[in-house]
Amino acid sequence: MTKTLTIRRPDDWHLHLRDGAMLRAVLPETTAHFARAIIMPNLVPPVVTFAQAQDYHARILAALPEGAEFTPLMTLYLTEDTDPDDVAAAHANGLVHAVKLYPAGATTNSASGVANFDNIRAVLERMAEIGLPLCVHGEVTDDDIDIFDREAVFIDRVLDPIRQATPGLRVVMEHITTRNAVDYATAQDDTLGATITTHHLVINRNHILAGGIKPHYYCLPVAKREEHRLALRAAATSGDARFFLGTDSAPHTDANKLLPCGCAGCFTATNTMSILAHVFEEEQALERLEGFASLHGPAFYRLPANEARLTLTKTPATFPSHIETEDGPVTVFDPGFVPNWTVV
């Protein structure tokens, strides 16, 4: 029986750090285990321009714990007014590694997102030319589309037409939640990748709604039926390089979660690696954890894999129920079981 597991230090290809007091509180939870992360730009106001990305990058570096070795990989928030030349300059500088597409109104702080996709055609064409990936929150926001169907409809109505109209555009389907997304991704070439979160490997929609509503399991895209969770687990543990870790760790204070209209997001930075090792062991795929967490993402983003290592031991993991911030506590994601693996 395996007692220890050593892998290349993992990266998080979808992370929310927020800003200010929240940034200072949650950043150490990520730097404890991860070497790099794709940083989401949905602040208020959003990180739209190269200059704004430079400023946010500086704030992240200033908040790093002493001795931390961590590289924030910045993104720009795509709007219908985004300047293709600004995007190209940000990419050429090496600071910005992706542009993020939020359909207007799809998730937290997405009001500035895209409503008319024809208005971003020039930006997407420039991105295809320079090889800059587009990270996509893949949900339509039409009121007449059921929330559990919005990812599947987005693939047909928006994503596939964008890819057909922009040959060579490199796209990351972020935080996929459906068998539809898994099937679409596995049928594509290497210009398409897909991130899978920790929590979507663990929970289905029953965990949110059955036996009383569980606000701390509410996220967007919302967790789906069990058949979709199982499809995600199969994809994540398959060894297919199209699939890689993006936690979508999304901290909100409890005061902002426990409301009549509470915020969406699960905070998983603290215990992701322990949970993933547990899940991969359940799927008899521990040897593929390194690929999912440490190798597939860098390969897609054309970056070297980390040389540093992370070691886990086969001992039950303990972690706090909350972390404290200046604005109040943030609940750490509870997988509903004690993970069998602990990060050394």
UniProtKB/Swiss-Prot annotation:
Molecular functions per Gene Ontology:
dihydroorotase activity; zinc ion binding
Q: Which residues carry this modification: N6-carboxylysine?
A: 100
Give an example GO biological process: 'de novo' UMP biosynthetic process
What's the EC number here?
3.5.2.3
Q: Looking at the record's lineage, which domain of life comes first?
A: Bacteria
Binding site residues for Zn(2+) 1: 14, 16, 100, 248
GO annotation, cellular component aspect: cytosol
Q: How is the cofactor bound?
A: Binds 2 Zn(2+) ions per subunit.
Pathway annotation: Pyrimidine metabolism; UMP biosynthesis via de novo pathway; (S)-dihydroorotate from bicarbonate: step 3/3
Q: Which residues are annotated as active site? A: 248
What CDD domains has UniProt attached to this entry? DHOase
Q: Which residues bind Zn(2+) 2?
A: 100, 137, 175
Protein family: Belongs to the metallo-dependent hydrolases superfamily. DHOase family. Class II DHOase subfamily.
Protein name (record)? Dihydroorotase
Per the UniProt record, the source organism is Roseobacter denitrificans (strain ATCC 33942 / OCh 114) (Erythrobacter sp. (strain OCh 114))
